[in-house]
Structure formats: C-alpha cells, structure tokens
Swiss-Prot record:
Gene that this sequence comes from: ectC
Lineage: Bacteria, Bacillati, Actinomycetota, Actinomycetes, Mycobacteriales
Name assigned to this protein: L-ectoine synthase
GO process terms (BP): ectoine biosynthetic process
Pathway: Amine and polyamine biosynthesis; ectoine biosynthesis; L-ectoine from L-aspartate 4-semialdehyde: step 3/3
EC number: 4.2.1.108
Organism, scientific name: Mycolicibacterium vanbaalenii (strain DSM 7251 / JCM 13017 / BCRC 16820 / KCTC 9966 / NRRL B-24157 / PYR-1) (Mycobacterium vanbaalenii)
C-alpha cells in the first residue's frame, strides 16, 4: 500500500513547475503500478500547448474554468469542475485557463518524473528514473 500527501511532495523532485503550471506527481513509474497520477494546477489567464505523443492522459477538472482546443479537429470544449477529457488519440491540444485550474491527471504509460516538455509540448517515449 502506498499513502502520500501533497504536503510531503511539495518542494521535492515530484513537485514540477513550468512557466504557467505546476504538477505534483503523486504516483510515478517507480511505484510499479502501471500508471502515474498527478495533481496539476495551471495559472489563470494562461495558454498551454501540449502533445503527448507517447502517453495517454485522462484529466479530471476539479477547480477553475477554461477551454480545451483539439488542434486535430479544431473543436473547442468548455472546461469546468466535473469535466473529464481523455487524450486517447495523442491529440495536440491547448488548455486556455480563464481562472486558475486544478486537475487530476492519469498517464499511461506512467511518467518517471524526469520528463520535460519539448518544444511541441510532448514528453519523450521513455526517460530513465534517477
């Protein structure tokens, strides 16, 4: 059994921040359960581009409002608490936040925690944990 709190993750290598977002990576590949689980917060009035070419991501919005743009189809979806989106086709997408948004995210395959978004907003296929 694994039990963790976000308080004990804060300020560690599981607490990853970029210009407009912060991700507390609660479960990672080295936990050996086949997925990773993150709490991600994205700043109000920000736009973030992502493209997970090697991962499927499920996202559950728990706080805040914004929009999700699917760059493959041009569709725009409202985001608010209770909204889930699944990137099962590795879609290039944009998250535009009207207010600060907090989301719970599951990745498969699991991330190691060492990944860095590249210029396309993607993670590499595999990164060795250290």
């Amino acid at each position: 059994m694994i039990v963790r709190t976000t308080d004990e993750i804060t300020g560690t290598n599981r607490d990853v921040a970029a210009e407009h977002w912060r991700s507390k990576r609660i479960i990672l590949a080295d936990d050996g359960v086949g997925f990773s689980f993150h709490e991600t917060t994205i700043d109000a009035n920000s736009v973030s581009e992502f493209h997970y070419q090697h991962h499927v991501e499920a996202v559950w919005v728990v706080e805040g409002t914004g929009t999700l743009t699917n760059h493959e189809t041009g569709e725009v979806h409202p985001l608010r608490p209770g909204t889930m989106y699944l990137l099962n086709g590795h879609e290039r997408h944009r998250v535009t936040c009207d207010t600060t948004m907090r989301m719970l995210c599951v990745f498969n395959p699991p991330v190691t925690g060492r990944e860095i978004h590249d210029e396309n907003g993607a993670y590499p296929a595999a990164v060795q944990a250290s």
